Swiss-Prot record:
Tissue-specific expression: Small bowel, spleen, colon, kidney, liver, stomach and femur marrow.
Region (7 X 3 AA tandem repeats of C-P-X): 65-85
Organism: Mus musculus (Mouse)
Propeptide: 20-58
One GO cellular component term: extracellular space
Subcellular location as annotated: Secreted
Pfam families in alphabetical order: Defensin_propep
Lineage: Eukaryota, Metazoa, Chordata, Craniata, Vertebrata
Protein name: Alpha-defensin-related sequence 2
Sequence repeat coordinates: 65-67, 68-70, 71-73, 74-76, 77-79, 80-82, 83-85
Keyword Secreted: yes
Record InterPro entries: Alpha-defensin, Alpha-defensin_N
Segments of skewed composition (Basic and acidic residues): 27-40
Role summary: Apparent precursor of a secreted, cationic, proline- and cysteine-rich peptide that contains Cys-Pro-Xaa repeats. Unlike cryptdin, the proposed mature peptide region lacks the structural motif characteristic of defensins. It may have microbicidal activities.
GO biological process terms held by the UniProt record: defense response to bacterium; disruption of plasma membrane integrity in another organism
Length: 91
């Protein structure tokens, strides 16, 4: 009976030592810096960096260049789309 208890204690001790060594290696790999970890950057863009024509139109809607007359093809248009001096409209 004493041999069985001693054998069981040795088996438990072996499992504990093995578990401690696995835990130590896991902690070491977590604290070590992974190669290229700091260099990884992600940039996501959903459109043109200068903006889109829709954004420009939304920002300038209702404005009219003082130099430009109303558009002859569309009298209800508040801006002149053909004027070369007009900076309100994207070309």
């Amino acid at each position: 009976m004493k041999k069985l208890v001693l054998l069981f204690a040795l088996v438990l001790l072996a499992f504990q030592v093995q578990a401690d060594s696995i835990q130590n290696t896991d902690e070491e790999t977590k604290t070590e810096e992974q190669p290229g970890e700091k260099d990884q950057a992600v940039s996501v863009s959903f459109g043109d960096p200068q903006g889109s024509a829709l954004q420009d139109a939304a920002l300038g809607w209702g404005r009219r260049c003082p130099q430009c007359p109303r558009c002859p093809s569309c009298p209800s248009c508040p801006r002149c789309p053909r004027c070369p001096r007009c900076k309100c409209n994207p070309k």
